[in-house]
């Protein structure tokens, strides 16, 4: 039988492949034309079927001989005729009476059976129990293809054990006779009449020849045996004639209700066992095709059991099968039990739920409950829509409350197994061509077809017309003189005159000219966008967008605006109600200035939390202001990549043509990069520079113990009396208990001022590991003067508007000159003297920490290549015409380089890159991957276009089964296209759930992603509800797996992909080298003017030393244009490079030890070097590898690239 199942499975696999290839089932001629191996399988299948049939015939003859031998066997009798073996006779030997005649004397035979039962007594019941136990050993019918074995003669003899002669007890015959009289009087004549009517209806059923009289559901007529639902005897008889069926109702009804109830539980167990066997079909389940049956020369198909075939006169249509199932249900009714006197007991219906609570409502609560129920019933009459049907508390069939689908009496859409299979056969899955014709989209296609039409090009949203300037510039672009209207607006804002640089910048914005303004911290940069916004709003309803980097900075900017200027902010930290209120005011043109984060601006139209709506829903935008514009050049790389797309989104989606950039620190190279983003053509003039105010006194020292030096400095005369101090250091240093040491040491120093005049607290921490409420509390306490010192990271202080900050201290080297200038610029804004000091480590530990961040953003060429392969997968669009000119090699991202324009046959496809899987595959952070994608979007060739993030996978589950899924596909084009694009592998069994890619489906259909998502969401609700309220369909639709969403071409050549890889890798390498060069240059500059210790800085500041530091910083910002020539000279020999030879042997041993301890990991040279430097990555997190201090941060003082080179050599030697 195992070989038969194997051969059947292979033949069915060949037939399915033939059907997919030719669109039809194979015929006899196709089988003869098949390969020799296939024909040999058909011949072997025929021989195996014949062998199985012969074995079944021998088994049937053996059973008949055993039955005849049992009839002829004579038993010694001394108790009368009640010991005869008539009850053990086979049902096949019963007299063949007509079904109609048996109905007429139904009651007579029932009484006769009851009388015989009385005569036989307990002996007959014992025989029946033994016979039941013996017959239970006969194998039940198994599904096709299952392994069966014919019983041997010995087992057949054991199936009929000899029954020992029982000894009757005295008085038992009289008890049985009395019980007979009671049971005869309890018979209901109406019940006999109903039985007569039911059996008469049975004669009218066209498919009655194949009925199953068991309590199970009607199964397809696969075998010629019928299971008799006898509670005491379970046997299988061959259906030979209608007369044999006429005997079965009498046997069913001849048992007492008590016996039926007592055996019901065991009967259920047997049925579960049979169902469990049937629920495990073999790989060859299912009939062969018609051509295959013709090939086997009239033999049974392999999907049917090897039983005696019964001629079925019934029709094979769905209507006949439904009538057959209805006819079967009449015979499943159990007889009515006799009325019994149960005394003080009642019957509980456990199928219906009854809720009885201890604390039931009484009195006022009960009257209120009744009042609510009454008005719920009147709700429809008063215009209400009734309770809304949900998926949790309503029936999936009828949509009513109070019951589940299993107790529903109304016919629902759910089908039986047979009807569901018939519907699957009658309703095949639509092809892609049919779906395209039905939906009107000609772009539904397979991903592997060569004739696939190109996907439609991504349409850019219509940009609104830009606003005209308030004061148009002259013919040569000159700015007009400042009119009196501008000065009047200045007075309305509370100012009397302009500060240096403000007037020129404001007039350029009012003339519609993009401007980059660089002013020191506290010089009034906010006025440069407030005044133009007010004047534009006075002329016509419009909006001014301000892009701000921090949420706390947004709140401060809104609160500091004058009352005549209406402003609001929009970010992800707001509640849904707050966002809706702000958007409502913006649409109504009640807001003059809208402050948003770059993430909210880039994700406009994505309907995410804190995202900005589309430009069509907003008033005309006068101009856009980007505060802290240096973030476009510094923060945009691997930290906040959305900054790279801010100007592109404003220009292409919002229609903005005038930009204003505000910053306090911008070198020459940073200014050129920012000007390129803002679209400032030609030479630009920096209004102001990063000049350090004269009231700041700077000093630098290199102390061996920086903690003790800080305490000594704060206890000195120079810093002892200062009330507001900001101390910048790393987060690790704050969390290592250093803050407690600072509080303890400073509390022991007495304060000469009177009680109540100074701050209440000494020092508090501020870093990203704290909650937002705690950070806000610390900042407010510092702003109100209740806190003397704030020990924080570099995130604190941006947008801080406290003019009397008296001191700023740095524990360690700052990240850059720009960061240092911004930090010290927060002190002394009131013009009074302020002090700033920098502590450096003499051994360079602070420089080592900063180098870690530069190396963390770099990646390998192999990771870049994998990303390019994921972004530009090949498509089947027709090839482009070959251009005569060859593409030039991409070297740098410069707008001056020209590229040949080639004819494009592929207009691009929408793709989704799952974030989590992409991060793990490339071992890169989300920000680093998005940065590389932004590089490709901003490239002159425009390799791709980034879209808002989306959920790529859709999981759809139908509670109604595969029939409901097929019905929904006819009214939902995306679902039909999904089934046609990804057909199920096994079509014999229906499926009720689907999981597919939404972006890929939308691209193949040519639809927008939003339309596809909306169509799938509509499947959860009934389009034609029976009531006024919306009703659920029982369909669950869930979107998951957040992914990068982009639009890219699929016809790039290998040369173009190599150019993209080189371009991205060169950009990453250039950023890393530039960051390292700046760090070394800054470290060298500060070391040249640093004191060996803080001793000279304790009492008073050194003016000469302060001027040296100021000159050094100003030189960096003014002479930045020579950076490219001096970068290699400035970098010089790398620190730690000369010590590598002394550590080489130890490094190699540690690499080998690391590889042996973790053989399951696939390390790379960069991964090993990151572990030695303490750099976490997605595949090698610090929470796991940071626990092993034998390797983590062990070689931080050595060069990163040298470690990576040694690790790569060891990996190659070990073959990994």
From Swiss-Prot:
Compositional bias (Polar residues): 86-100, 114-137, 248-262, 306-320
Ranges spanned by the short sequence motif DEAH box, renumbered to the chain: 627-630
Name used for this protein in its record: ATP-dependent DNA helicase Q4
Sites where the protein binds ATP: 519-526
CDD domains for the chain: DEXHc_RecQ4-like (cd18018), RecQL4_SLD2_NTD (cd22289)
Species name: Mus musculus (Mouse)
Cofactor, how bound (note): Binds a Zn(2+) ion per subunit.
GO molecular function, one term: ATP binding
């Amino acid at each position: 039988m195992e070989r038969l199942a194997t051969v059947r499975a292979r033949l069915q696999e060949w037939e399915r492949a033939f059907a997919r290839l030719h669109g039809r089932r194979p015929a006899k001629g196709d089988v003869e034309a098949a390969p020799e191996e296939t024909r040999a399988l058909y011949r072997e299948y025929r021989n195996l079927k014949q062998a199985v049939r012969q074995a079944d015939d021998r088994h049937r003859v053996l059973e008949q001989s055993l039955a005849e031998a049992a009839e002829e066997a004579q038993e010694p009798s001394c108790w009368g005729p009640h010991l005869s073996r008539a009850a053990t006779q086979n049902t096949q030997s019963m007299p063949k009476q007509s079904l109609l005649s048996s109905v007429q004397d139904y009651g007579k035979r029932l009484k006769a059976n009851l009388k015989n039962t009385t005569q036989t007594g307990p002996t007959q019941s014992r025989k029946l129990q033994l016979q039941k136990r013996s017959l239970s050993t006969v194998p039940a019918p198994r599904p096709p293809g299952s392994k069966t074995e014919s019983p041997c003669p010995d087992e057949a003899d054991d199936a009929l054990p000899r029954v020992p002669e029982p000894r009757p007890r005295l008085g038992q015959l009289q008890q049985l006779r009395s019980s007979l009289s009671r049971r005869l009087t309890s018979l209901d004549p109406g019940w006999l009449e109903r039985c007569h009517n039911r059996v008469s209806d049975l004669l009218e059923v066209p498919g009655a020849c194949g009925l199953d009289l068991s309590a199970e559901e009607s199964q397809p007529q696969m075998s010629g045996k019928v299971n008799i639902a006898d509670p005491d005897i379970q046997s299988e008889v061959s259906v030979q004639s209608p007369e044999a069926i006429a005997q079965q109702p009498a046997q069913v009804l001849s048992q007492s209700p008590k016996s039926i109830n007592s055996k019901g539980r065991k009967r259920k167990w047997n049925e579960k066992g049979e169902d469990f066997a049937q629920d495990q079909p073999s790989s060859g389940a299912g009939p062969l095709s018609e051509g295959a049956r013709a090939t086997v020369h009239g033999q049974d198909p392999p999907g049917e059991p090897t039983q005696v075939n019964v001629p079925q006169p019934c029709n094979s249509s769905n209507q006949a099968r439904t009538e057959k199932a209805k006819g079967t249900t009449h015979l499943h009714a159990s007889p009515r039990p006799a009325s019994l006197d149960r005394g003080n007991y009642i019957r509980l219906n456990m199928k219906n739920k009854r809720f009885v609570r201890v604390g039931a409502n009484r009195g006022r609560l009960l009257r209120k409950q009744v009042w609510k129920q009454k008005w719920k019933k009147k709700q429809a009459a008063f215009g209400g829509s009734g309770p809304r049907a949900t998926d949790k508390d309503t029936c999936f069939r009828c949509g009513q409350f109070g019951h589940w689908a299993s107790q529903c009496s109304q016919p629902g859409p759910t089908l039986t197994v047979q009807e569901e299979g018939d519907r699957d056969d009658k309703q095949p899955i639509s092809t892609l061509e049919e779906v395209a014709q039905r939906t009107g989209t000609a772009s539904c296609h397979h991903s592997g077809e060569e004739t696939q039409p190109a996907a439609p090009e991504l349409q850019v949203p219509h940009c609104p017309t830009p606003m005209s300037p308030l004061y148009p510039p002259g013919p040569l672009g000159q700015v007009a003189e400042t009119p009196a209207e501008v000065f009047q607006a200045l007075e309305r804002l509370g100012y009397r005159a302009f500060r240096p640089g403000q007037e020129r910048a404001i007039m350029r914005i009012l003339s519609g000219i993009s401007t980059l303004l660089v002013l020191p911290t506290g010089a009034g940069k906010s006025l440069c966008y407030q005044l133009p916004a007010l004047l534009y709003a006075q002329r016509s309803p419009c909006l001014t967008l301000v892009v701000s980097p921090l949420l706390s900075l947004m709140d401060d900017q809104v609160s500091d605006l004058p009352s005549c200027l209406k402003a609001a902010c929009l970010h992800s930290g707001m509640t849904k109600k707050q966002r809706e209120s702000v958007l409502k005011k913006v649409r109504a043109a009640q807001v003059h200035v809208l402050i948003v984060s770059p993430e909210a601006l880039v994700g406009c139209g994505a309907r995410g939390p804190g995202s900005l709506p589309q430009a069509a829903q907003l008033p005309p935008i006068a101009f856009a202001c980007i505060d802290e514009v240096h973030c476009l050049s510094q923060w945009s790389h691997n930290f906040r990549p959305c900054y790279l797309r801010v100007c592109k989104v404003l220009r292409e989606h919002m229609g903005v043509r005038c930009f204003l950039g505000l910053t306090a620190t911008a070198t020459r190279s940073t200014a050129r990069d920012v000007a390129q983003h803002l679209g400032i053509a030609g030479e630009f003039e920096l209004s102001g520079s990063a000049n350090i105010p004269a009231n700041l006194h700077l000093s630098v020292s290199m102390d061996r113990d920086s903690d003790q030096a800080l305490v000594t400095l704060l206890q000195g005369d120079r810093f002892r009396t200062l009330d507001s101090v900001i101390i910048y250091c790393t987060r690790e240093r704050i969390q290592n208990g250093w803050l407690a040491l600072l509080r303890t040491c400073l509390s022991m120093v007495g304060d000469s001022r009177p009680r109540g005049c100074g701050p209440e607290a000494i020092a508090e921490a501020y870093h990203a590991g704290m909650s937002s409420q705690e950070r806000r509390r610390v900042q407010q306490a510092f702003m109100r003067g209740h806190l003397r010192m704030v020990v924080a990271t570099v995130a604190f202080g941006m947008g801080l508007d406290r003019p009397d900050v008296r001191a700023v201290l740095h524990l360690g080297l700052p990240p850059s000159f720009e960061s240092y200038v911004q930090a010290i610029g927060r002190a002394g804004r009131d013009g009074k003297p302020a002090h700033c000091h920098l502590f450096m480590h003499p051994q360079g530990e602070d420089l080592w920490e900063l180098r870690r961040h530069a190396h963390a953003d770099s990646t390998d060429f192999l990771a870049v290549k994998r990303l390019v392969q994921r972004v530009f997968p090949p498509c089947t669009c027709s090839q482009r015409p070959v251009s005569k000119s060859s593409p030039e090699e991409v070297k740098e991202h410069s707008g001056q380089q020209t590229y040949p324009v080639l004819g494009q046959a592929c207009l691009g496809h929408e793709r989704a890159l799952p974030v989590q899987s992409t991060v793990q595959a490339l071992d890169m952070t989300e920000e680093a991957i998005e940065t590389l994608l932004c590089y490709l979007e901003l490239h002159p060739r425009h390799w791709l276009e980034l879209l808002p993030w989306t959920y790529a996978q859709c999981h759809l589950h139908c509670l109604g089964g595969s029939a409901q899924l097929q019905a929904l596909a006819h009214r939902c084009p995306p679902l039909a296209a999904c089934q046609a694009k990804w057909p199920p592998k096994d079509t014999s069994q229906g499926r009720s759930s689907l999981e597919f890619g939404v972006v890929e489906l939308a691209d193949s259909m040519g639809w927008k992603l939003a339309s596809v998502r909306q169509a799938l969401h509509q499947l959860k609700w009934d389009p034609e509800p029976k009531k006024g309220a919306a009703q659920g369909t029982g369909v669950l639709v869930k979107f998951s797996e957040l992914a990068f969403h982009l639009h890219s071409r699929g016809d790039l050549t290998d040369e173009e992909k190599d150019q993209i890889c080189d371009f991205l890798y060169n950009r990453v390498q250039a950023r890393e080298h530039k960051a390292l060069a700046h760090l070394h240059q800054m470290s060298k500059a500060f070391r040249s003017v640093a004191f060996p210790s803080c001793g000279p800085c304790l009492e008073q500041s050194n003016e000469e030393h302060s001027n040296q530091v100021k000159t050094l910083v100003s030189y960096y910002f003014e002479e930045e244009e020579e950076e490219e020539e001096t970068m290699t000279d400035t970098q010089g020999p790398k620190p730690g490079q000369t010590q590598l030879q002394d550590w080489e042997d130890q490094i190699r041993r540690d690499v080998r030890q690391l590889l042996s301890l973790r053989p399951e990991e696939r390390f790379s040279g960069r991964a090993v070097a990151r572990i030695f430097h303490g750099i976490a990555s997605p595949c090698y997190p610090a929470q796991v590898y940071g626990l092993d201090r034998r390797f983590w941060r062990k070689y931080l003082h050595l060069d990163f690239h040298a470690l990576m080179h040694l690790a790569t050599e060891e990996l190659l030697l070990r073959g990994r």
